[in-house]
Amino acid sequence: PSSISIYGENIAINNVGISQGNKYVRANGIVSSNESDSLTIELNELPVDYIQDVVNFHSVEFGGRASGRAYVTGINNSTPTLDAYIKVRNMIFEEGRMGNANLHAFWDSEVEGISSKGVMIDEGDIYTGVDGYVSPKNNRIDLLVSTHNTRAEFLNGIIGSIFDDIDGHVNGDL
């Protein structure tokens, strides 16, 4: 069974979640200002576009199904930390198929956003590296994208107003 217990300024969360079929988000841990207390959030097959809606971030569009874990500490203090290991099945970036993503993300107080590093592996020798950050609060994104035979479809979402039906493969850093 699930439970939420409140002790002064601390909140203990035990197996609290929402699910539908194989999709779920689940939380366990303690919410407090103590940095040794943490909250673990588990995701399974959660739609990435839904996550974008929740944080109200649409500077660029992502899609796919996210699964993994995020660890949050010091939620009630001025410098909380977030450390997440996420896999995204059938990742979409700006209308382009990117394959399956393995990402490490963490809260970066310097940019007031989430810094991430990872790789998206498509079929054959197609893969794309990513390193940078997104800041929903400041509506900013700064990503170094390293392409290796990456499908060029994602450029439709970026420069599609200038060029139509971009297809092919891309190599190099963007």
Where are these regions (language model features)?
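Interface amphipathic segments
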Residues: 1-173
